[in-house]
Amino acid sequence: MTEPTRSIDDLSPARVTTAFDLPGHTTVRSLGVAQGIVVRSRSIVGSFGASLQTIFGGNITLYTSLCEKARQQAFDKMLADARKLGANAIVAMRYDSTEIGSGVTEVICYGTAVRVTQDA
């Protein structure tokens, strides 16, 4: 599905990149770091189901799903933070995660919030 036409002032996932500049655009102002943090824990039922999956090997789908949801939530929070800063793009976006306790994981998504103009 094609993304609807957006104004240059709108921040959309299409204007988020891991590169240090957004192709086809010129960075006119850096607004600081935008970030989104999510702390997730596994439920007892989920941990039990995942431990059963480890017996058979392969992808542990319960944990994969948990990680994907946490990354998406952190990404969405980063977008909201960047919008508060007045950004219409994010460059140098990264993810990081850390286990901060038994079964508790922090996922952070961060990048540089910027204002860009479209190249002629």
Curated annotation (Swiss-Prot):
The UniProt entry, under InterPro entries, shows: UPF0145_dom_sf, UPF0145_YbjQ-like
Q: List the disulfide bonds.
A: none
HAMAP family in the cross-refs? UPF0145
Q: Which family does it belong to?
A: Belongs to the UPF0145 family.
Name of this chain's protein: UPF0145 protein Bcenmc03_5217
Q: What is the lineage of its organism?
A: Bacteria, Pseudomonadati, Pseudomonadota, Betaproteobacteria, Burkholderiales
